[in-house]
Every structure is written in structure tokens, then in C-alpha cells.
């Protein structure tokens, strides 16, 4: 990876997942996101690259931070941004996702950002509309921009991703964040571990090129990055953990468990956090935490994704307005 030249061109119409992206595609987005950071830190946080373009955010699942991040990203690029409130939409009256897609397509948007509880919803939408589609999370399938912002955060702090030991800990079973991160980190040459109780591990982990641990002590040993996952109790249909208190005792990241990792290990969390469940407050707010940097990198990455998809200089085959 280190000797390959990264092209400024992004040869995709949609961003539906990390799966399907080459390592060079990923690096293209990360390199562009570096440039977007500078824009966000200027007094006038604005570019005109997407002036005249229309972005519709279609969130079937509530997510204040992700939706706000996409909205801010679009506005900083100069796009006209519309947030569609699903709670007040025809979806609540029985309209299907395909019906919604056809209706939105008739409005001639340039890009649709969708979050949905069903895996594959973004891919289905992409088949039905004439504009670009960005997956902001579909069920337990993927969350590509979260993985990209995590990679950007790691790369800025550590200078590289290749050969780093990254431990992903917690509710892996229900986590689209874990899946996308595993795909991306493997693509860029990291050594990926997952740490979780057996009840929170999906089948087939061995096929994803990761090391699996049921012990935090073993899984965090010499880790460069500790990525905690939220315990997603709203997605749990059965009894996956005996109690929240017991879960924190064995799998919550506190100062004592963090000592198993390298002294300069990064602490990450995609948010929202359950303090005292998967992570202790003094660790979340401690000197090794880069959780707030992840939020900042999220805006930069989403700016990069939309610019890569819609700017004709970066995507000649997909750069004309819809």
C-alpha cells in the first residue's frame, strides 16, 4: 500500500459500503478528507463545489449526530440540503421504500443519504433512483462513512494504519460499524481483533480475517487502538448479557483494562456512548480518548464522499447534475 500512487479520481456512483472499494479508493477519500479538515477550520467554512446541487437526507432511524454531520457537510460544500422527516412522511401512511424512492427521484435530487433499519435498503434505493446514494447505515450491514472517519482519525494520530493492532470490542453481533471497520482496516493492512462475549459475536468471524477473543486482557494486549462499540439493547431480541453491571465488569473499558493496551493506545467510540456500560467516563474523557476528534473527522469525511461522488473533476462519469 505504501508505494502505490493514489488517484484523485473516485470511480463510483454510490457509496453503499466499504465492500466493493479498493484500498486506493479508500485512500482517495481519506486524502480528500484531509483537505476538507482545513475548510472546516477556516473562519468562513464554505466551498462552492456543490453549489446548485440538491442533497436529501432520508433517515428512517433517528440519528442526531450522523444526520447533523451529513447536513453540515453538504452545506459546507455549498449544496442545498433537505432533511426529510420520516415521522411525518407518507412512509407512516404505508408507502413502501420503493414508492418513496420513486417520489424523491421525480424531484431530481443529486444525492440521497439514507439510514434504514433493513440491511440492503441503500442498495435497493440506488437501483431505483437516478442520482448518487450514500449509505448512512443499513441494519447490521454497513456504515461506511463511520469506518472512513475512524480510519482518518487513526491515520492522523498514528501516521499510518498498516500493521497497527486494532481491537474492536463489545456488541459486534449487532454492529454495522464493526463490519465496515473490519473491511476497511483489513484493506489497509491493519491487524484486526474482535473482543466480545460469545453471545455477541456473529457467525463466520473467522472468515473475516480477524482474531477473536473473549477476554479483554488477551484481546487488548499491545493494542494500538481500542475501539469500543455501543451495547445495542434496542436491537436485542433475547438475553445476550446477564446484566449491564456484569457486562461492564467483564467488557467495559476502564483504566485497569486499558493498561493491557499500549501506553499510547487510542480510545475510540462511534457514539452515542453508554457511559458505565461499555466505557467508563474517566476513560471516555481521558487523555487517550479521540472520541471528539472522531466527530470532527465525520464532517470532513462526509464532505469528501459527496465531493468525490458529485464533483466532475473527481468523478467525470457522475459529475453532471441529475
Curated annotation (Swiss-Prot):
Binding-site residues for L-aspartate, renumbered to this chain: 93, 176, 230
Keywords: Pyrimidine biosynthesis, Transferase
InterPro entries assigned: Asp/Orn_carbamoyltranf_P-bd, Asp/Orn_carbamoylTrfase, Asp/Orn_carbamoylTrfase_sf, Asp_carbamoyltransf, Asp_carbamoyltransf_Asp/Orn-bd
PROSITE patterns: CARBAMOYLTRANSFERASE (PS00097)
Top-level taxon: Bacteria
GO terms under cellular component: cytosol
Reaction(s) catalysed (UniProt annotation): carbamoyl phosphate + L-aspartate = N-carbamoyl-L-aspartate + phosphate + H(+)
Record's keyword annotation contains Transferase: yes
GO molecular function terms noted in the UniProt entry: amino acid binding; aspartate carbamoyltransferase activity
GO biological process per UniProt: 'de novo' pyrimidine nucleobase biosynthetic process; 'de novo' UMP biosynthetic process; amino acid metabolic process
Binding site for carbamoyl phosphate: 65-66, 115, 143, 146, 271-272
Pathway the protein acts in: Pyrimidine metabolism; UMP biosynthesis via de novo pathway; (S)-dihydroorotate from bicarbonate: step 2/3
EC code: 2.1.3.2
Function: Catalyzes the condensation of carbamoyl phosphate and aspartate to form carbamoyl aspartate and inorganic phosphate, the committed step in the de novo pyrimidine nucleotide biosynthesis pathway.
Subunit structure: Heterododecamer (2C3:3R2) of six catalytic PyrB chains organized as two trimers (C3), and six regulatory PyrI chains organized as three dimers (R2).
Family: Belongs to the aspartate/ornithine carbamoyltransferase superfamily. ATCase family.
Protein name listed in UniProt: Aspartate carbamoyltransferase catalytic subunit
Lineage: Bacteria, Pseudomonadati, Pseudomonadota, Alphaproteobacteria, Hyphomicrobiales
Amino acid at each position: 500500500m505504501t508505494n502505490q500512487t493514489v488517484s484523485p479520481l473516485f470511480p463510483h456512483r454510490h457509496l453503499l459500503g466499504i465492500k466493493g472499494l479498493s484500498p486506493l479508493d479508500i485512500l482517495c477519500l481519506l486524502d480528500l478528507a484531509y483537505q476538507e479538515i482545513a475548510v472546516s477550520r477556516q473562519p468562513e467554512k464554505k466551498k462552492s463545489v456543490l453549489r446548485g446541487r440538491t442533497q436529501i437526507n432520508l433517515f428512517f432511524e433517528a440519528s442526531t449526530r450522523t444526520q447533523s454531520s451529513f447536513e453540515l457537510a453538504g452545506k459546507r460544500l455549498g449544496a442545498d440540503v433537505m432533511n426529510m422527516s420520516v415521522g411525518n412522511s407518507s412512509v407512516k401512511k404505508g408507502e413502501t421504500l420503493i414508492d418513496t424512492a420513486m417520489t424523491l427521484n421525480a424531484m431530481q435530487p443529486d444525492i440521497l443519504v439514507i439510514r434504514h433499519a433493513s440491511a440492503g435498503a441503500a442498495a435497493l434505493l440506488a437501483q431505483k433512483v437516478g442520482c448518487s446514494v450514500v449509505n448512512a447505515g443499513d441494519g447490521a450491514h454497513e456504515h461506511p462513512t463511520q469506518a472512513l472517519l475512524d480510519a482518518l482519525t487513526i491515520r492522523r494520530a498514528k501516521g499510518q494504519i498498516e500493521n497497527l493492532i486494532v481491537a474492536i470490542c463489545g456488541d459486534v453481533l449487532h454492529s454495522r460499524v464493526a463490519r465496515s471497520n473490519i473491511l476497511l482496516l483489513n484493506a489497509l493492512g491493519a491487524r484486526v481483533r474482535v473482543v466480545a462475549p460469545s453471545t455477541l459475536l456473529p457467525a463466520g468471524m473467522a472468515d473475516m480475517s480477524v482474531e477473536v477473543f473473549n477476554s479483554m486482557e488477551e484481546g487488548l494486549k499491545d493494542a494500538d487502538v481500542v475501539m469500543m462499540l455501543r451495547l445495542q439493547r434496542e436491537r436485542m431480541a433475547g438475553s445476550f448479557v446477564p446484566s449491564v453491571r456484569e457486562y461492564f465488569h467483564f467488557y467495559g473499558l476502564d483504566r485497569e483494562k486499558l493498561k493491557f493496551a499500549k501506553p499510547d493506545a487510542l480510545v475510540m467510540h462511534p457514539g452515542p456512548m453508554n457511559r458505565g456500560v461499555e466505557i467508563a467516563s474517566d476513560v471516555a474523557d481521558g487523555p487517550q480518548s479521540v472520541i471528539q476528534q472522531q466527530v470532527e473527522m465525520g464532517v470532513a469525511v462526509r464532505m469528501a464522499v459527496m465531493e468525490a461522488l458529485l464533483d466532475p473533476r473527481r468523478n467525470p462519469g457522475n459529475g453532471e447534475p441529475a
